Amino acid sequence: MLTDLGADVIKVEPPAGDMTRFTYPRVNSQSTYFVQQNVGKRNISIDMDKPAGVELAARLIESADVVVENFRPDVMRRLGLDYSRFAETCPRLIYASISGYGASGPWTSRRAYAPVVNAETGITKHQGDVRGGSYANDPHSHGDVYTAVETASAILAALYQRERTGKGQYVRSEEHTSELQSHLNLVCRLLLEKK
């Protein structure tokens, strides 16, 4: 999304590549999902299990205007790459963290997958009701898209704020919350009907 707005995005991938590179459907040996999600991005492979990889990632962060990471909350902290490491040395940095279930609470360390979050937030049931009782999972990653829109909006607001104040900031979003907010009218209806 940010590349569409003119950002120069460097995507960091593990040595084996982003797992969505290997998904279907494919056209000319390329995953259509990967291409759609990563069009316009430059890529670099970094082995974050090695100290040299972590330091390379730290140098990339120090040179960035905006960082977006989507690990579980404990991962960047464990690697020493969380916002607190860079807040003082990079005061203009905008650091966005995306997680499945937030930075605290009983589900914070759970991995989030769009089909699971679809079911947890009621989208699967709602779509099944509309389809006359066919509750097959929707193949579209609603949660990924909704969370990307929410995160991009937060980053744009933070960039605007930085222009006014000169200060960067930490922003975060959660896939579960983003997806739930996308259909609050359904949630409200269910609560009012007490289903």
Identify the role of each PLM range:
Residues 1-164, 170:
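N-terminal helix-loop segment corresponding to the beta1-alpha1 unit
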Residues 21, 169-171, 184, 188:
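Extracytoplasmic/periplasmic beta-strand context in beta-sandwich domains
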Residues 175-195:
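Single conserved hydrophobic/aromatic residue that forms the stacking wall/gate
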